[in-house]
């Protein structure tokens, strides 16, 4: 169910932006040709733009809008010493709040696979994409 939901949203976004759709189609055709016209695991791993499209889809339409985590140790909230997350306390992490933060992802409503390119990922904290 989660895979089909992600693929449905990816296809929806690609239908809205035919230039992205064409770029992905060209990558798929070129990569399959490079792998002797065989669609294998290695072939799929070579589709870097495909990974970006799927990652951006998951960023814009997260399957889990919130993540529940348990604090491993006491944590004093920076700048607020009276607020302490006690060890063992359950914490809700708002996935969609992080993914839609314009400080991290400019124009968060825009579908832009380039924001998840290898170069862009190196400039961002690894916890900014859940």
Describe these PLM feature segments.
Residues 9, 35-38:
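Long, K/E/R/D-enriched contiguous segments that form extended
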Residues 61, 93-123:
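Conserved cytochrome P450 K-helix/beta-meander segment immediately N-terminal to the heme-binding cysteine loop
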Residues 14-19, 28, 32-35, 61, ...:
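A generic secondary-structure signal for well-formed alpha-helical elements
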Residues 81, 118-130:
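Cytochrome P450 heme-thiolate "Cys pocket" and heme-binding signature region
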Residues 8, 25, 29, 55-62:
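Amphipathic, well-packed alpha-helical segments that form the structural scaffold of globular domains
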Residues 2-19, 23-27:
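Cytochrome P450 catalytic-core helices
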Residues 38-83, 102:
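Conserved cytochrome P450 K-helix E-x-x-R motif and the immediately C-terminal K′/meander segment
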């Amino acid at each position: 169910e989660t895979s089909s939901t992600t693929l449905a949203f990816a296809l929806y976004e690609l239908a809205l932006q035919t230039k992205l759709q064409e770029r992905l189609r060209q990558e798929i055709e070129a990569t399959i040709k490079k792998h002797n016209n065989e669609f294998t695991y290695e072939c799929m791993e070579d589709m870097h733009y495909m990974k970006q499209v799927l990652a951006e889809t998951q960023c814009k339409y997260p399957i889990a809008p919130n993540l529940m985590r348990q604090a491993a140790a006491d944590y004093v909230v920076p700048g607020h010493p009276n607020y302490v997350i006690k060890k063992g306390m359950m914490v809700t992490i708002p996935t969609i709040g992080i993914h839609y933060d314009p400080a991290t992802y400019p124009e968060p409503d825009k579908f832009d696979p380039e924001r998840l390119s290898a170069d862009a990922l190196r400039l961002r904290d690894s916890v900014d994409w859940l």
